């Protein structure tokens, strides 16, 4: 045993710098606290990009910084989060730059309720993925059960509370206790057997109940075997495990979850006074319906009585109806006859207008009129055509070459009969035809002068 643990550091009246002090303190801490276990709750969890994990480990009275480097963090199986209770192993070291000491960890394990909570979450996720919590699997509770099975401990306040509720609210319901342990490892197979037995007894509903306790005390109701036994029950089952704040896997699998065992009993035990009020309400509704029905039937009967009369009265009504129909038929016949008579008159008028003699007379008058108009039209047309012809003859005479020839001019034609317009079209000795106003001459070109010659228009 070291009597003076600081003697080995050589601190006899030596004046140290802060860095030297922190360095020697780190050596001392790492030498003494080399491989220790510490239990606490995680807070201020941080995961930087480096892959290291930093958090504060705390209990009700103190806290210490922890560092879990990347290579050790990769070996931690459970997900770390704030509030998780853990056990950590490592060494105590000192961060010289700030003078803060910390735990350098190599192992992190869940502790106490923390481990149970991880197992709870894992099983919950597994069963939820299988559909054991889905609403489609839930069976509705019977409205008026007669026989109920209770799976619980035969001792304790739970069974007494359940029986008390049924005695007060529904004393006529038959209760059967299927005793089982409700805590510890031995409780798991007992609860499974009790569920199978109760489901085979043909109860109207089942209650799975236990009083409050810690998460560890209630853990048997979070076991997979118990959850699957609850799911396998055909009988509607109410899970009432722990207090209102306690939630178990069996609560999720059961058809209905009750916050307490007493609440489970109230769900299945209809209140007698409430039933009496329901019956009274139904009685009042039935009386009202009967009165309404009687009133309706009475009115209907009175209406039928009014319609039911003496046969003689019915015959008089029929005779009156026949007279009315006869009068209506006569009026209709007269209206039809008048309508047809008026139509016949209109047709006769139209036919008279279409008589052949009348048509022939009209045609004869039209023919005579046309015969009178035709000679006059022919004379007028002939006169107009004559005037038009004279105008065209005058126009033709003005533009005709013959009129020009008549005034003393001539037209020279070559051997092909083409008109000679310029002297350049001729050559000396060429024979031409000169066409005059009357007759023609054969001429020969003695000479062709290409210079223009001005003609007098006064000759």
Curated annotation (Swiss-Prot):
Query: Biological process GO annotation list?
Result: DNA catabolic process
Record's catalysed reaction(s): Exonucleolytic cleavage in either 5'- to 3'- or 3'- to 5'-direction to yield nucleoside 5'-phosphates
Identify the enzyme class: hydrolase
**Pfam families of this UniProt entry?**
Exonuc_VII_L, tRNA_anti_2
Q: Which InterPro entries match?
A: Exonuc_VII_L, Exonuc_VII_lsu_C, OB-fold_nuc-bd_dom
Q: Which GO terms describe its molecular function?
A: exodeoxyribonuclease VII activity; nucleic acid binding
Against Gene3D superfamilies, the record matches this protein to: 2.40.50.1010
**What is the E.C. number?**
3.1.11.6
The answer to whether UniProt assigns keyword Cytoplasm to this entry is yes
- The UniProt entry lists the main location of this chain as cytoplasm
One annotated Gene Ontology cellular component of this protein: exodeoxyribonuclease VII complex
The cellular location(s) given in this protein's UniProt record come to: Cytoplasm
Its keywords, alphabetically, are:
Cytoplasm, Exonuclease, Hydrolase, Nuclease
PANTHER family according to UniProt: EXODEOXYRIBONUCLEASE 7 LARGE SUBUNIT
* NCBIfam families for this protein: xseA
- How the protein assembles, per its UniProt entry? Heterooligomer composed of large and small subunits.
* Protein family membership: Belongs to the XseA family.
What this chain does, per the entry, is described as: Bidirectionally degrades single-stranded DNA into large acid-insoluble oligonucleotides, which are then degraded further into small acid-soluble oligonucleotides.
Q: What is this protein called?
A: Exodeoxyribonuclease 7 large subunit
Q: Which organism is it from?
A: Pseudomonas fluorescens (strain SBW25)
Lineage of origin: Bacteria, Pseudomonadati, Pseudomonadota, Gammaproteobacteria, Pseudomonadales
Q: Which gene encodes it?
A: xseA
């Amino acid at each position: 045993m070291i009597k003076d643990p600081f003697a080995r550091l050589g601190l006899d009246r030596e004046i140290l710098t802060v860095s030297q002090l922190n360095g020697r303190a780190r050596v001392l801490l790492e030498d003494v606290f080399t491989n220790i276990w510490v239990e606490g709750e995680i807070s201020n969890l941080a995961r930087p990009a480096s892959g290291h994990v930093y958090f504060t480990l705390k209990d009700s009275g103190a806290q210490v910084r922890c560092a879990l480097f990347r290579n050790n963090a990769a070996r931690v199986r459970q997900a770390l989060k704030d509030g998780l209770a853990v056990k950590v192993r490592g060494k105590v070291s000192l961060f010289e730059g700030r003078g803060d000491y910390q735990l350098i960890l190599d192992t992190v394990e869940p502790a106490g309720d923390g481990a149970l909570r991880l197992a709870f979450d894992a099983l919950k996720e597994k069963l939820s993925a299988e559909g054991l919590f889905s609403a489609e699997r839930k069976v509705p509770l019977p409205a008026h059960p007669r026989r109920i099975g209770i799976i619980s401990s035969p001792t304790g306040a739970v069974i007494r509370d359940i029986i008390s509720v049924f005695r007060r609210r529904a004393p006529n319901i038959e209760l059967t206790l299927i005793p089982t342990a409700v805590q510890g490892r031995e409780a798991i197979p007992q609860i499974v057997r009790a569920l199978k037995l109760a489901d085979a007894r043909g109860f109207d509903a089942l209650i799975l109940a236990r009083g409050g306790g810690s998460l560890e005390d209630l853990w048997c109701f979070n076991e997979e075997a118990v959850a699957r036994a609850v799911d396998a029950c055909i009988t509607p089952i109410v899970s009432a495990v722990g207090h209102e704040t306690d939630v178990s896997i069996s609560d999720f699998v059961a058809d209905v979850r009750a916050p307490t065992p007493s609440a489970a009993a109230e769900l299945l035990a209809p209140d007698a006074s409430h039933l009496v009020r329901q019956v009274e309400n139904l009685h009042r509704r039935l009386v009202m319906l009967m009165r309404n029905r009687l009133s309706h039937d009475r009115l209907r009967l009175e209406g039928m009585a009014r319609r039911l009369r003496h046969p003689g009265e019915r015959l008089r009504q029929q005779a009156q109806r026949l007279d009315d129909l006869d009068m209506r038929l006569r009026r209709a016949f007269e209206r039809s006859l008048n309508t047809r008579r008026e139509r016949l008159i209109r047709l006769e008028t139209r036919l008279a207008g279409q008589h052949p003699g009348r048509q022939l007379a009209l045609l004869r008058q039209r023919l005579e009129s046309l015969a009178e108009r035709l000679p006059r039209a022919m004379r007028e047309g002939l006169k107009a055509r004559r005037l038009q012809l004279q105008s065209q003859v005058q126009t033709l005479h003005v533009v005709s070459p013959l009129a020009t020839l008549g005034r003393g001019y001539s037209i020279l034609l070559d051997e092909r009969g083409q008109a000679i317009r310029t002297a350049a079209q001729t050559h000396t000795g060429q024979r031409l035809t000169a066409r005059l106003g009357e007759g023609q001459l054969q001429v020969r070109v003695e000479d062709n002068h290409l210079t223009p010659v001005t003609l007098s228009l006064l000759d």
